[in-house]
């Protein structure tokens, strides 16, 4: 946990679908609330799976959040707060370089910036903003799900279309849940062709 005297920092919570990223973000933000630190939580406009104006985990935990599309909006809302939380980083409409730059600006202002999101897309390729933040962050927590095929630790998000792995030419970002994605380990993951 960051003390105000320590200055700004970036914390990244990453992993595949169903690894508990948002659950961990919510847990940290509940601690922030108990500590009476000022904060703002942001969720991308593109994420329409749950009630607007909330970050919500697959297990049903949720906290109020501000729905935005760009880092410019986050920077405007996050003035003079101690903690900034950004869920589902990979779903923001903004240029990945702007998302990274904005996180750096917030941390340089002295904020604790907590970012959660997928590290890899369904093709097992890194999301650009997350890839850079993993290198720049003071703290990185990679979470794992359980492979639906064999029960091993899962690190991949398998996108399914009609029950079969999505082809390589499918859109990179499609918001969905259990009906569209499975958590899989390296051995059970079927590469997009």
Swiss-Prot record:
- Enzyme Commission identifier(s): 2.7.1.21
Report the principal subcellular site: cytoplasm
What Pfam families does the record point to?
A: TK
What's its catalytic activity? thymidine + ATP = dTMP + ADP + H(+)
Question: What's any GO biological process attached to this entry?
Answer: DNA biosynthetic process
EC class, as a word, reads transferase
Question: Where is it localised?
Answer: Cytoplasm
Binding residue positions for ATP: 15-22, 87-90
Instruction: Name the keywords, alphabetized.
Output: ATP-binding, Cytoplasm, DNA synthesis, Kinase, Metal-binding, Nucleotide-binding, Transferase, Zinc
User: Mind listing the GO molecular function terms for this protein?
Assistant: ATP binding; thymidine kinase activity; zinc ion binding
Entries under PROSITE patterns matching the protein: TK_CELLULAR_TYPE
- Name the family: Belongs to the thymidine kinase family.
* Subunit structure comment from the entry: Homotetramer.
What is this protein's record name?
Answer: Thymidine kinase
Q: From what organism does this protein derive?
A: Chloroflexus aggregans (strain MD-66 / DSM 9485)
Q: What is the lineage of its organism?
A: Bacteria, Bacillati, Chloroflexota, Chloroflexia, Chloroflexales
Q: Which gene encodes it?
A: tdk
């Amino acid at each position: 946990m960051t003390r105000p005297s320590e200055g700004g920092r970036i914390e990244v919570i990453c992993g595949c679908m169903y690894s508990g990223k948002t659950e961990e973000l919510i847990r940290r933000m509940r601690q922030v609330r108990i500590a009476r630190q000022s904060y703002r939580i942001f969720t991308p406009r593109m994420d329409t799976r749950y009630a607007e104006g909330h970050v919500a985990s697959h297990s049903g935990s949720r906290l109020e959040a501000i729905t935005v599309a760009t880092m410019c909006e986050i920077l405007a809302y996050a003035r003079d707060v101690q903690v900034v939380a950004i869920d589902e980083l990979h779903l923001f409409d903004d240029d990945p370089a702007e998302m990274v730059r904005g996180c750096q600006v917030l941390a340089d202002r002295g904020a604790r910036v907590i970012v959660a999101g997928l590290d890899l897309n369904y093709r097992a390729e890194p999301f650009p903003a997350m890839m850079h933040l993993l290198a720049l962050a003071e703290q990185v927590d990679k979470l794992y799900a359980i492979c639906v095929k064999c029960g091993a630790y899962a690190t991949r998000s398998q996108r399914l279309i009609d029950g079969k792995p999505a082809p390589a030419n499918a859109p990179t970002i499609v918001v969905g849940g259990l009906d569209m994605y499975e958590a899989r380990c390296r051995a059970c993951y079927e590469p997009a062709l």
